[in-house]
Amino acid sequence: VEIACLDLEGVLIPEIWVAFAEKTGIDELKRTTRDEPDYNILMRYRLDILNKNNLGLIEIQEVINTLSPLDGAKDFLDWLRERFQVVILSDTFYDFAQPLMRQLGYPALLCHQLHVGEDNKLIGYKLRQANPKRQAIVGFKSMYYRTIAAGDSY
């Protein structure tokens, strides 16, 4: 069995934080891991901006619900699934990805978890593990799966 691992944002779907930044007019939220490779620094930065602007999960999900997979993404994923076991490895959050996973036919997804307060505000997050994309590939290889990976983080 061969496993194909794909990044999600910028590969199969639009960048969620960029779409949210454009909708809200808050350009600071356009920063991605390409701009700030330390994910913890990037997320603390994002959470601070959200709190300063009194924005939470509901507002982000409203924007996500307007998004669609990139042109050809679903067809490509269907083609790939006929040939490989497909796993999406992403630095996004389950609360963000779910509506888009539905549109992509629910591929296996490994990502992070948000901590949301009762007031809808994002109060933190839990990384699946340190260096999660690389560690997933290492894990698959340790189980003797032939693994390929594609995206801006591999």
PLM feature spans:
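A short glycine-/small-residue-rich loop at the edge of a beta-strand within enzyme catalytic domains
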Residues: 64, 124, 128
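Short, charged, surface-exposed secondary-structure boundary motifs
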Residues: 117-125
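Conserved Lys-Pro-Asp/Glu-containing loop-to-beta segment of HAD-superfamily phosphomonoesterases
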Residues: 128-154
